[in-house]
Amino acid sequence: MADTMVAHMDRHNKIDVEISEDDKRLTKLCSLKKKAINATNKFKHSMTKKGRRHSRVACVSIVDEIDTEELQAVDAFRQALILDELLPSKHDDHHMMLRFLRARKFDLEKAKQMWSDMLNWRKEYGADTIMEDFDFKEIEEVVKYYPQGYHGVDKEGRPIYIERLGQVDATKLMKVTTIDRYVKYHVKEFEKTFNVKFPACSIAAKRHIDQSTTILDVQGVGLSNFNKAAKDLLQSIQKIDNDNYPETLNRMFIINAGCGFRLLWNTVKSFLDPKTTAKIHVLGNKYQTKLLEIIDANELPEFLGGKCTCADKGGCMRSDKGPWNDPEIFKLVQNGEGRCLRRSLSGIEEKTIFEYNNETKKKCEPEETHKQSAAEMEKKFIDTNVDAAAAADWPTKLNKAEKNPTDLKDVYSAVNPLERKGYLYGSVMALLMGIVGVMRLTKNMPRRLTEANVYSREGSAVYQDGVTVMSKQEYIAMVKKITDLEEKCKSMEAQAAFYMEREKTLDAALRRIDQLELQLSETNKALDETMTRQHEIMAFIEKKKKKKRKFLLF
């Protein structure tokens, strides 16, 4: 009994000492309590705010047009990438993953292989830092001999890329730069397009933009425009674009195409995918009406039938006109706006706000006190040396305090003086953050095993020992399906052989065209020499006639 009394007195003295020390610090903690309350109120306000879109910033509203089926495919693709550790945070973008899926016709394994190759290429090529590391000083000279660049946007907000292939001088181009340097410049421009131009267009159009409209002017295109070096350059650029920046073309207009080009295109497009050919429109010299249906006249250069001249910037091909030149839009792009937040299938409000709060906390709440987590607040306001009797009495007094706010003083007196409003808000914050964190973790966990267990129980008999038995009907159906697949494979192999023959025929036709163009060039040269010789002979005959007349006069 005496020991119990001594222990009780020691504990009582300990509490008295703590209370006296805490009273001295109570005034200092008032400001911390107020800051914690303000931070909690702001968090609660963000939880109840309505009308927030899936955007990283509240002030820019961007429409995301991905449908449910595509979102399901992206979600499955994302889980596969996470399992194989192929998803850096920089590339955790559902639009980027969707482009790779579309490029491989939603074949998960092929898209994953393409994604892996892209990551390896970016690491080896240094694409992530090429905007800062590479300086293309010869750009002014290059544009003279290879007129190309972005100019304006179409009516749907996509940037317009223009190339005047008929004015390409490959010989002079290779004198001012090299193939490697131009390819690096091309990659740098593509990175700039994804990091600056597409987000700027998305902000201006208020819808997600990650594709462009291309115009190729082929007037005057011939063998003289493209030597071997130029062909190698175009092949290198095309390979990089197809392998690492897929599905960035929305539509392409090939203008000023002659009869020969159209005939060749009709032959070539039979070997291309129908979706690809649907994007390409081959037009003659009456293309203005078609372009103006897609592009506003003020956004289209004058030499293509529009009204824009960009006289103050040295011409349309040098102006780089577009919303990315707007200072306000460019500032928003630099702040990380113009990008859609990764969407999920569940649509849980807490998860979206949690991600939004983590990503924009520094912009929306610049005060240093708002950077404290719920766990840190709880550590500041909770003392571990709480008397057991006081802790047991806490729920009862808290219920009374909820009914009568004036009893809050009694509630706080049951525990350490540090545990007042800070404890309440800290506990709520910790609980809320814990729930949201668990929801995020469980949602992003791989679901292959779960799905396998679910689907294995549908349409089959499972005994208690876990052995699955296949019925006779299921076996027959499976054999029939395998037979059908084998027939389809054989049919595809036959079609592949047929396409190989057509490709060989096309290659032979292209070689024949090259030979004919070479013969035509030689014939023109011989004809010019013959004409020159004929003029010399005529001049000689005329000279002889004059001498003969003089002789007859004498």
Swiss-Prot record:
UniProt xrefs under PROSITE patterns: CRAL_TRIO
Subcellular location: Golgi apparatus membrane; Cell membrane
InterPro entries membership: CRAL-TRIO_dom, CRAL-TRIO_dom_sf, CRAL/TRIO_N_dom, CRAL/TRIO_N_dom_sf, PI/PC_transfer
Membrane topology reported for the UniProt record: Peripheral membrane protein
Main location: Golgi
GO cellular component, one term: Golgi membrane
Gene Ontology BP, a term: protein transport
Keyword flag Cytoplasm: no
SMART domains, sorted: CRAL_TRIO_N (SM01100), SEC14 (SM00516)
Alphabetical keyword list: Cell membrane, Coiled coil, Golgi apparatus, Membrane, Protein transport, Transport
Domain of life: Eukaryota
Coiled coil, from the record: 472-534
Pfam families: CRAL_TRIO, CRAL_TRIO_N
PANTHER family in UniProt: CRAL-TRIO DOMAIN-CONTAINING PROTEIN YKL091C-RELATED (PTHR45657), PHOSPHATIDYLINOSITOL_PHOSPHATIDYLCHOLINE TRANSFER PROTEIN SFH2 (PTHR45657:SF19)
Family: Belongs to the SFH family.
Functional note: Required for transport of secretory proteins from the Golgi complex. Catalyzes the transfer of phosphatidylinositol and phosphatidylcholine between membranes in vitro.
Name of this chain's protein: Phosphatidylinositol/phosphatidylcholine transfer protein SFH2
Source organism per UniProt: Arabidopsis thaliana
